[in-house]
C-alpha cells in the first residue's frame, strides 16, 4: 500500500501542475464535438433533399439556391444561341459588381473539376467569354447597341475579347476569300477559253459558268488555297522601293530639266547682249561723222551763248561800227 501510494502521488502532483493545459484541451474538444453534432444534424436534415441529386461541390454538404436552380442554357430565349446575360443568368440592368459576383459563383459551378451537371470545358470557356464582354463598359455598351462582340460558335480562350474574335473572323474570311481563293483545278473550261464571259468563265475566277452548269449563275467558292489578300513584308518593301525609285527618278528628271532651262535662258541673254553690242558698233561706224558734226555744232552754239551772256554783264567790250574816212581830194 505504501509503495502504491508513493507511486500515485507524483501523478497527482503532475496532473495538478498541468491542469490549465488540460482544461483548455477539454474545452476545445467539447467545442469540436458540439460543432460535429450540429453538422451531423444539419446533414441529416438535408439528406432527404440531397439524396435525389448529386453533390454540387466537393467536400460541401449544403447547396445554395444558385447551384440548385442554375443550368447552362443551350438555347436563348429567341431560339438561337444564348447571349452573355442568359449565360450568366443576369438581367440586362445588372451592375458591374453583380456581374463580378455572379461570375465567381458560376465559375465554381461550371469549372471542369466541379460535379455540377452543367460543368464542362466548353461551358466554362463560354462563361469566361461572357464575363470578358460584360465586365468592360465599352464592350457591354457596344453589345447592347449593336449586338456585335458575342459569338458562341467561335472557340476562343478565356482571355480573348470580342474585338479579338472579330479580328480573327475577319482574317479567316480574308483567308478563305483571298486573292488565290479561286481554285483553278475546278475550272470547267480550257485555258484558251479564258476571258470569254459566260461561255468559258473568267480566268481563275469561276465567274459565269457554262450554260450546262446546274447552278446557271455566279457561285463563288467558299474555300481556297488560303493565300491572304494582304501583302507580305518582302513584297511590301519591294513595292515601297520601286515607288521610291520612281519618285526619285521623276524629281531628278525635273531637276535636270530645270537646270537645262536655266542654262538656255542664260545663253539667250548672252546672245541678245552680243547682238545689241554689234548693232551699236555698226551704227557708230555708219553714222559717226554725222553725230560728231552735230556735237561740234552744239558745242560752238554753247560757247557763243556764253560769250553773249558775258557781254551783257559788261565783261567784254563790244566793238563799235567802223569809222568813215573823208573823201579824198584826188578827184
From Swiss-Prot:
UniProt transit peptide range: 1-36
Region (Disordered): 35-66, 203-226
Domain IQ stretches: 275-303
PANTHER family registered for this protein in UniProt: DNAJ HOMOLOG SUBFAMILY C MEMBER 9
Biased composition (Low complexity): 40-53
Disruption phenotype: Decreases electron flow through the mitochondrial respiratory chain complex III. Increases level of depolarized mitochondria. Abnormal cell wall structure resulting in abnormal capsule attachment. Sensitive to iron starvation. Abolishes cell population growth on non-fermentable carbon sources (glycerol, lactate, and succinate). Decreases cell population growth. Decreases virulence in a mouse intranasal model of infection.
Subunit and partners: Interacts with QCR2.
Function: Mitochondrial co-chaperone required for ubiquinol-cytochrome c oxidoreductase (mitochondrial respiratory chain complex III) activity.
Entry superkingdom: Eukaryota
InterPro entries named among the record's database cross-references: DnaJ_domain (IPR001623), J_dom_sf (IPR036869), J_domain-containing_protein (IPR052594)
CDD domains hit by this protein: DnaJ (cd06257)
Record flagged with keyword Mitochondrion: yes
Keyword terms: Chaperone, Electron transport, Mitochondrion, Respiratory chain, Transit peptide, Transport
Claim: tRNA processing is one of the keywords in the record: no
Protein source organism: Cryptococcus neoformans var. grubii serotype A (strain H99 / ATCC 208821 / CBS 10515 / FGSC 9487)
Subcellular location: Mitochondrion
Gene Ontology biological process terms, A to Z: mitochondrial electron transport, ubiquinol to cytochrome c
Gene Ontology cellular component terms for the protein in this record: mitochondrion; nucleus
Residue span, J domain: 83-147
This protein's name: Mitochondrial respiration co-chaperone MRJ1
GO MF, one example: heat shock protein binding
Family: Belongs to the DnaJ family.
Amino acid at each position: 500500500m505504501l509503495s502504491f501510494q508513493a507511486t500515485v502521488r507524483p501523478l497527482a502532483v503532475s496532473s495538478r501542475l498541468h491542469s490549465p493545459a488540460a482544461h483548455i484541451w477539454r474545452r476545445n474538444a467539447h467545442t469540436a464535438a458540439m460543432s460535429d453534432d450540429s453538422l451531423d444534424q444539419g446533414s441529416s436534415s438535408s439528406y432527404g433533399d440531397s439524396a435525389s441529386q448529386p453533390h454540387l461541390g466537393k467536400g460541401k454538404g449544403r447547396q445554395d439556391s444558385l447551384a440548385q436552380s442554375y443550368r447552362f442554357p443551350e438555347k436563348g430565349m429567341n431560339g438561337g444561341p444564348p447571349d452573355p446575360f442568359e449565360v450568366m443568368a443576369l438581367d440586362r440592368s445588372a451592375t458591374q459588381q453583380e456581374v463580378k459576383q455572379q461570375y465567381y459563383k458560376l465559375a465554381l459551378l461550371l469549372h471542369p473539376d466541379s460535379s455540377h451537371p452543367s460543368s464542362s470545358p466548353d461551358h466554362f470557356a463560354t462563361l469566361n467569354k461572357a464575363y470578358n464582354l460584360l465586365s468592360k463598359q465599352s464592350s457591354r455598351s457596344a453589345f447592347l447597341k449593336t449586338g456585335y462582340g458575342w459569338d458562341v460558335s467561335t472557340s476562343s480562350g478565356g482571355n480573348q475579347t470580342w474585338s479579338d474574335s472579330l479580328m480573327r473572323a475577319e482574317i479567316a474570311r480574308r483567308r478563305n476569300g483571298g486573292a488565290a481563293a479561286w481554285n483553278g483545278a475546278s475550272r470547267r473550261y480550257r485555258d484558251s477559253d479564258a476571258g470569254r464571259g459566260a461561255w468559258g468563265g473568267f480566268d481563275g475566277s469561276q465567274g459565269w459558268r457554262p450554260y450546262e452548269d446546274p447552278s446557271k449563275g455566279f457561285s463563288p467558292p467558299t474555300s481556297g488555297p488560303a493565300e491572304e489578300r494582304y501583302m507580305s513584308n518582302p513584297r511590301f518593301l519591294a513595292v515601297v522601293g520601286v515607288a521610291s525609285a520612281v519618285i526619285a527618278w521623276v524629281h531628278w528628271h525635273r531637276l535636270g530639266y530645270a537646270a537645262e532651262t536655266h542654262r538656255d535662258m542664260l545663253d539667250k541673254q548672252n546672245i541678245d547682249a552680243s547682238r545689241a553690242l554689234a548693232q551699236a558698233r555698226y551704227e557708230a561706224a555708219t553714222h559717226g561723222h554725222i553725230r560728231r558734226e552735230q556735237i561740234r555744232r552744239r558745242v560752238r552754239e554753247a560757247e557763243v551763248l556764253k560769250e553773249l551772256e558775258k557781254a551783257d554783264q559788261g565783261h567784254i567790250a563790244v566793238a563799235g561800227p567802223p569809222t568813215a574816212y573823208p573823201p579824198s581830194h584826188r578827184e
